[in-house]
């Protein structure tokens, strides 16, 4: 039975939820067929597998200035005319014309490509399931926006406010038309049931074929964090830094035996280093680039404690974060250090 999946990301780019889903759908004799945006990333190349994928490329320019201009043009076209969704729907329609499909699944972290999925589900009279991995309301501020507009501060606020309104309007319209909605945490379920009562919880989970306990002897006590920090409002390491500073002050640890290892991107490293300036912890920290997702189980199993960062739940704080990293960390059986977490 064929299922058409529209999603904003899919392996080899970051996209574990849909990547793992397709892996196990095929084993259950379903036939997932994917339409997704072309993204230059190979973090999850091992999850591509044999799933047929149509990659829709929206960005073609080379060079920093041309890329910026192209991004602005695409943003404007998409804002006013649903450019990306229309192009995605066109690619999906070609597939639907070629064969029989039992339904459509659309997975998004924000809104795109929900309007495309809504359109083709109505056009071809197919049931629509929407899966929301993240939603705008969960963020403490504007972390859901990948690019800063960098105009005047007052204009930035106006653009952001208008953009947020459009994202929510388009998302909620699609939710109301969906036959089923799935999402990642109890908080998300409660929030989304206001738009579609048929909203169910499907945790991110982990792949037991990759993540399981292993025994490794190490010469150092290692606290490990893998992932991204998009802001201190969402993930705050300062409570950890305060604790390490106290242990250092009381001479209970030393850098030869105690390490904090960060597997993060350059933007996350900058946030961490800025947060650490008020604490004498730099000599305890090591930074590594992202590693392929297939190597993460080994990194976790060679650690002493796995760090999970969050921030205090509040009306203006982060809400409902239950990432794949949390479940993968639990799967390897290591102790978890949770900083200011509320889920």
Q: Where are the regions a protein language model picked out?
A:
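Acidic donor-binding loop of glycosyltransferase active sites
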Residues: 179, 300-319
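Conserved small/polar residues in nucleotide/adenosyl-binding loops
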Residues: 342-343
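Nucleotide-activated donor-binding/catalytic signature segment of Leloir-type glycosyltransferases, i.e.
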Residues: 257, 262-264, 269-298
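Acceptor-binding helix/loop patch of EC 2.4 sugar-transfer enzymes
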Residues: 8, 63-76, 99, 129-168, ...
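Carbohydrate-associated surface elements
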Residues: 187, 205
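Conserved donor-binding/catalytic core segment of Leloir-type glycosyltransferases
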Residues: 215-237, 241-244
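N-terminal subdomain of nucleotide-sugar transferases
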Residues: 1-58, 180
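Membrane-proximal helix-turn-helix segments that form the acceptor-binding/catalytic region
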Residues: 86, 90, 112, 119-123, ...
């Amino acid at each position: 039975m064929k299922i058409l999946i529209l999603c904003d990301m899919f392996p080899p780019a970051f996209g574990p939820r849909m990547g793992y889903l397709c892996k196990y759908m095929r084993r259950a004799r379903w036939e997932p067929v994917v339409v997704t945006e072309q993204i230059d990333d190979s973090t999850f190349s091992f999850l591509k597998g044999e799933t047929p994928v149509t990659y829709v490329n929206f960005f073609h320019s080379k060079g920093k200035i041309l890329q910026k201009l192209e991004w602005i043009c695409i943003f404007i076209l998409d804002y006013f005319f649903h450019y990306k969704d229309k192009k995605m729907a066109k690619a999906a329609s070609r597939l639907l014309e070629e064969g029989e499909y039992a339904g459509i699944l659309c997975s998004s972290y924000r809104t795109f490509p929900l309007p495309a999925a809504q359109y083709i589900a109505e056009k071809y009279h197919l049931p629509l399931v929407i899966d929301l991995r993240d939603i705008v309301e969960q963020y403490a501020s504007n972390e859901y926006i990948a690019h800063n507009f960098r105009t005047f501060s007052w204009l930035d606020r106006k653009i952001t406010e208008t953009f947020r309104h459009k994202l929510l309007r388009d998302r909620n319209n699609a939710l109301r038309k969906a036959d089923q909605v799935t999402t990642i945490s109890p908080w998300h379920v409660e929030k989304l049931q206001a738009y579609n009562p048929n909203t169910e919880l499907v945790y991110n989970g982990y792949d037991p074929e990759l993540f399981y306990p292993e025994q490794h002897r190490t010469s150092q006590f290692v606290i490990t964090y893998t992932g991204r920090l998009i802001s201190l409002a969402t993930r705050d390491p300062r409570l950890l830094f305060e604790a390490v500073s106290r242990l250092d002050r009381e001479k209970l640890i030393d850098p030869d035996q105690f390490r904090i290892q960060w597997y993060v991107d350059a933007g996350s490293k900058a946030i961490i280093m800025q947060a650490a300036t008020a604490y004498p912890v730099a000599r305890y920290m090591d930074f590594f680039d992202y590693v392929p997702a297939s190597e993460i189980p080994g990194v976790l199993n060679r650690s002493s404690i796995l760090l999970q960062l969050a921030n205090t739940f509040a009306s203006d704080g982060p809400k409902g974060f239950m990432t794949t990293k949390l479940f993968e960390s639990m799967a390897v059986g290591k102790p978890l250090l949770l900083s200011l977490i509320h889920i």
